[in-house]
Amino acid sequence: MKILLVEDDDVLIKVLTKNLTTHHYIVDVVKDGEMGWTYGSTFEYDLIILDIMLPNLDGISLCKRFRAQGYTVPILLLTAQDNITAKVQGLDAGADDYVVKPFDPIELIARIRALLRRGSNNPFPLLTWGDLLLNPSTCEVTYNGCPLNLTTMEYDLLELLLRNCQHVFSSEELLDKLWSSEDFPSEATVRSHVRRLRHKLVAAGAPHDFIATMHGRGYYLKAPSTEEVNNLSVTPENNSHSAAVIVKSRETESDRPQHLIPSDSQQQYLAFLNETWTRTKPQSLDQMGILLQIVRDLQTNQLTPQQQTQAQHVAHKLAGTLGIFGLTKTMHIARQLEYWLGGRERLQPKHAPLMKTLVTALQQDIDHTTLIQLSQIPAGQSPLLLMISADNEFNQSIVAVAASRGIRIQIAPTPDIAPAMLTNEPVLDGFGEDPDVILMRLPSMPSRAEVIEQPNSELSNIWKTLQTFAERYPKLPIVVIGDRGEMSDRLEAMRRGGKLFLVTPTPPEQIVDTVVNLLRDPEIPNKVMILDDDQDWLRTLPTLLKPWGFKVTTLADPQQFWTVLQAVTPDALVLDVNMPQINGFELCQLLRSDPHWQRLPVLFLSVLTDPTTQNQAFAVGGDDYLCKPVKGVELANRILRRLQRVRAWAN
């Protein structure tokens, strides 16, 4: 499969090309938007990867140009801009997906595979044809269970044929699909690779014409025999090729751990990163000279708009580069610089102290990083602990233990976080993702008499911070740890949104074990089905209920109620009262007449406020009744209350 990469960051180009070629993709690289248009409109590609900030023509404009000219090739945007506006702008321009730097190489490759499957005749994760099975995730190929040892080009050729199993490929098409635009092999080279691939397939037991030749046209996969197709399925009714593929795909993938890199491959990738960092570090330090000059010019009020724009591009590139190497903390500093430099207003001398602090911290972090550690490589599915603490000694003890448990940590200084969240400033953008659990370290608390005499502003701020995080992450467990275990402290922590309260001195191992136990018992998302004929209102519900972790299914047609109900098997049901053809009361009675659904919580939601209607709702088997308009938090709490009662009854 052939990919066009349009990116101007040399380090990112090197790392991305390494990952893509390892997974058997052919990559063409250009460094500006206009060249991206030239290549993309001249050669045929299976996927285009674009950075948003490009010289000559930005990625958004380039994406729009491709779509305006009728090009339907999948486009993946790759950028450091982690905000909703940028994502919406990119997707509206015609992009098919959006990945934020720093990215997990495994996730990026998985997204690429998903995009390529959409345009393929074979949309399944595993590619099969008769007794042949190719797993794009692991690049493994077997025939009738026997592994095939293929060269890179043989693998690429076989994958192309499998993804386009109904197509006859001419030699010219294969040359265009399988070789870079800079290579010019002959048709004899194609015939040689086909011949060697056929030989290996026949040696594994495949028919001689497994890869068939249509004279004058090209090469194609011959349809497998009926016996081969039936052998793929584990049940008599799954005799179709599509069903067989699904069955085999599920069986094979269920036995294989997901999103894991073999240790030897990971070590090779780590060695590659360190080798690349050795060459990149001096270049990054050289770029710091531009940022240091910005600080000096800012102090003397001599900064020009052109200099500020240039510095923003430097910070943007540094953020992307540092993210590639897993230097998350350093990347966050670069992102903050990019944010301030890219503001709508020109920087003033009053901003000089802030800029000097950020630039100095960035320079020191880059200078002190001599070796990329394994733990710095993007960790994929490993859980993220957000620790809100200003106690450096405590932080270091937790970091050491958490690393041994496979937990990633982000440390947030308490005074900076709550105000930023309350004013919607982008300080939290640097975290890149929502945490899985929050650990909050309370400051040293004075005695009650001292508090009465002189209120502790730091303690007041920490309680506000706790409440702020609890409101933003209502389903997220927050662990509070303090020096005192008095009832007043525990009560305040629970009122503000804390879930667990620990008292120092608690060993770091015990604290991390507490976090691990919270992670081991994640709540299964509650499935909620909502039936209402107001489609505009229905469209708002998934967003309204998202903070509570509900998996929402909406339905506007009462005639489809029973079919959707059985398919979704919800944990709770919300019904409108007045609907065309069948009203909510009738649907509730229908539900209660089936033993399987007699205990399903049913909430009625209606504009009708009269007591007669409400009494009728409870008479037909409803559990609750809400009047429109209703706020998302009220609806969510009513649903949660019904679910808690059902589960308490079941226990």
From Swiss-Prot:
Gene name of the encoded protein: rcaC
Any Gene Ontology CC annotation: protein-DNA complex
Keyword Transcription regulation: yes
Residues carrying 4-aspartylphosphate: 51
DNA-binding region, residues: 124-223
Protein's name in the database: Protein RcaC
Residue span(s) of domain Response regulatory: 2-116, 384-519, 527-643
Species for this entry: Microchaete diplosiphon (Fremyella diplosiphon)
GO biological processes: regulation of DNA-templated transcription
Database matches in SUPFAM superfamilies: C-terminal effector domain of the bipartite response regulators, CheY-like, Histidine-containing phosphotransfer domain, HPT domain
Transcription regulation recorded as keyword: yes
